[in-house]
Amino acid sequence: MRSLIIVLLFPSIIYSMSIRQCEKTEEETWGLKIGLCIIAKDFYPERTDCSVHLPTASEGLITEGNGFRDIRNTDKL
C-alpha cells in the first residue's frame, strides 16, 4: 500500500514543477535532481567485471541481479 502511494505521488510532483530553458546570455545555470528509490524483494547480486564512467565523478562499480543494476561511485566508498 505504501509503494502505491509513492507511485501515485511521484507524477504529481514532476508535473507541478516548472522548468524553463536557459538563455545563452544568462550566467547562471539551474539544475534539477530527482531521486527515485526502488526496493526489490529477494535481490540476488552477481559480481560482474563491468565498470561505468560517470560524467560527474570517476568510475562506478556495477552489481547485477534480478534485472537490476547497482551503480556505486568509487569516490564515496
UniProtKB/Swiss-Prot annotation:
Q: Sorted alphabetically, which InterPro entries does this protein's record hold?
A: Apoptosis_reg_M-T4, M-T4_sf, Poxvirus_T4p_N
Question: Does the keyword ATP-binding belong to this entry?
Answer: no
Q: How far does the signal peptide extend, from start to end residue?
A: 1-17
Record keywords: ATP-binding included? no
Q: Sorted alphabetically, which keywords does the UniProt record give?
A: Late protein, Signal
Q: Which conditions up-regulate this protein?
A: Expressed in the late phase of the viral replicative cycle.
Question: Family per UniProt?
Answer: Belongs to the orthopoxvirus OPG195 family.
Protein name (record): Protein OPG195
Native source species: Vaccinia virus (strain Western Reserve)
Q: What's the name of its gene? A: OPG195
